[in-house]
């Protein structure tokens, strides 16, 4: 007994979390200190995918048996039912079978109890295509700081007294929002006055009924991630606005709407973009008249780190190059242009007068598919004059094979980048082949005497 009593409070609380409510009640008779500590339940977990695990009914009974004075730090409930296998399955990337209405009632009974117990971390994954509705108490909890909701159900409206005064992190997975009188999504953000991080995963904006505005004065990190890239209907995908003046980080993966009506991203420091027009993926002739992403592009003017994940994203910058701002603060640029033309590269370099690090995520580009095989360099980079005034210090290339044509293009980089200090290339070469690759690079003339090479296998 003395050995256990001498343990720190957090260890005793952890031990107590494995006891049933009945067992915990018996142990509290042994010590006043234990009585106080065992009213704290660090975690409540239920996962229907665990084979031979606790049943939903047993979990609900366990929650309902919690003493009125108990406090719950974290709830994690993952549930759906697969009728074909008569067992619960859980996978965030697959579509599950629907949960039965009777099970909805059981789940919500337990949620209401936990929400009254001072819960801080609330994770709920319940598949409810056929009418699941979150209890209103989710949107009036004063203690929750981290809220994660999924998957497949809709949030139609919030209660009039909706307020989450402590919520800092909100994650939404395949959740849809509608509006009945007022926009549920807008109301949720407005009811979270200290929200700092928002993740919207599996988003299909065009299927929502909403204000088409992401608005939060406190938000610092925003992740928007589309999962489904087929069967896209843009008939009701006209515009999106961002009013997030404190946002420092943006990850944005989606189709481009027809227009960004209003964009406030003045505090943005780091941006990662994966954007494409409609289902054809590539920008084509006439798209500059059908789309207007200019407000978004101007909203990026203060970024310091910019990652353009795809050729489609880089091409958007090229198509609207006349309207691009100068990115005075941009010091780190990553681009993935695959084997396509680098037409956007000279323009991006010129628009970033203080660029220090360029990461080419992929191979060097030395010829176009539309030119004869004898041409080493594509017209888009043939002169390389855009490099002369670039203050680049670090050049990284994630796919390098050491071919003659790659060496010739590398020669152009090295001869014109007078501030270059490090060239880092990633190669699968090993042994003597790697030594030859390094030796070939070392023989190239350099405008910068400080330039060193690093080959990463």
UniProtKB/Swiss-Prot annotation:
Which UniProt keywords are present, listed alphabetically?
Answer: Leucine-rich repeat, Repeat
According to its UniProt entry, one GO biological process term is:
anther dehiscence
User: Is-annotated flag, keyword Repeat?
Assistant: yes
Keyword ATP-binding on entry: no
LRR repeat ranges, renumbered to this chain: 53-79, 147-174, 177-202, 229-254, 283-310, 337-362
Occurrences of domain F-box (ranges)? 1-49
Under SUPFAM superfamilies, the record lists: F-box domain, RNI-like
- Please name the CDD domains in this protein's record: F-box_AtFBL13-like
The identity of this protein, by name, is: F-box/LRR-repeat protein At3g62440
Source organism per UniProt: Arabidopsis thaliana
Q: Write the lineage as a comma-separated list.
A: Eukaryota, Viridiplantae, Streptophyta, Embryophyta, Tracheophyta
């Amino acid at each position: 007994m003395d050995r256990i009593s001498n343990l720190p409070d957090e260890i005793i609380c952890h031990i107590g979390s494995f006891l049933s409510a009945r067992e915990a009640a018996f142990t509290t008779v042994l010590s006043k200190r234990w009585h106080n500590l065992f009213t704290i339940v660090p975690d409540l977990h239920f996962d229907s995918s665990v084979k031979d695990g606790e049943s939903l009914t047993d979990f609900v009974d366990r929650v309902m048996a919690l003493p009125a004075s108990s406090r719950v730090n974290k709830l994690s409930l993952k549930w759906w039912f697969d009728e074909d296998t008569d067992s619960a399955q859980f996978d965030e990337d697959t579509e599950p079978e629907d949960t039965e209405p009777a099970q909805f009632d059981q789940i919500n009974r337990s949620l209401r109890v936990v929400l009254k117990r001072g819960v801080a971390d609330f994770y709920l994954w319940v598949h409810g295509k056929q009418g699941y509705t979150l209890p209103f108490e989710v949107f009036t909890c004063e203690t929750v700081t981290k809220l994660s909701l999924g998957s497949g159900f809709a949030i139609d409206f919030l209660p009039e007294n909706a307020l989450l005064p402590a919520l800092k992190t909100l994650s939404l997975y395949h959740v849809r929002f509608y509006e009945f009188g007022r926009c549920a999504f807008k109301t949720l953000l407005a009811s979270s006055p200290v929200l700092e991080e928002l993740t919207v995963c599996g988003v299909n904006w065009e299927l929502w009924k909403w204000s088409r505005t992401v608005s939060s004065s406190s938000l610092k990190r925003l992740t928007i991630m589309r999962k489904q890239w087929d069967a896209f209907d843009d008939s009701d995908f006209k515009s999106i606005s961002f009013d997030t003046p404190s946002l420092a980080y943006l990850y944005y993966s989606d189709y481009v709407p027809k227009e960004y009506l209003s964009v406030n991203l003045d505090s943005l420091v780091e941006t990662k973009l994966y954007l494409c027009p409609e289902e054809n993926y590539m920008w084509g002739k006439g798209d500059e008249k059908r789309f207007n992403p200019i407000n978004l592009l101007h909203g990026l003017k203060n970024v310091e780190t910019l990652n353009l994940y795809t050729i489609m994203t880089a091409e958007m910058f090229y198509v609207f190059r006349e309207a691009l701002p100068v990115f005075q603060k941009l010091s780190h640029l990553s681009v993935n242009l695959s084997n396509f033309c680098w037409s956007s590269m000279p323009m991006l370099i010129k628009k970033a007068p203080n660029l220090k690090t360029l990461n080419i995520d992929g191979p060097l580009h030395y010829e176009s598919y539309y030119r004869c095989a004898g041409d080493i360099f594509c017209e888009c980079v043939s002169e390389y004059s855009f490099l002369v005034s670039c203050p680049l210090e670090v050049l990284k290339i994630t796919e390098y094979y050491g071919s003659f044509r790659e060496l010739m293009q590398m020669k152009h980089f090295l001869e014109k980048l007078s501030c270059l200090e490090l060239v880092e290339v990633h190669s699968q070469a090993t042994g003597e082949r790697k030594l030859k690759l390094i030796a070939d690079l070392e023989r190239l003339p350099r405008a910068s005497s400080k330039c060193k090479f690093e080959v990463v296998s």
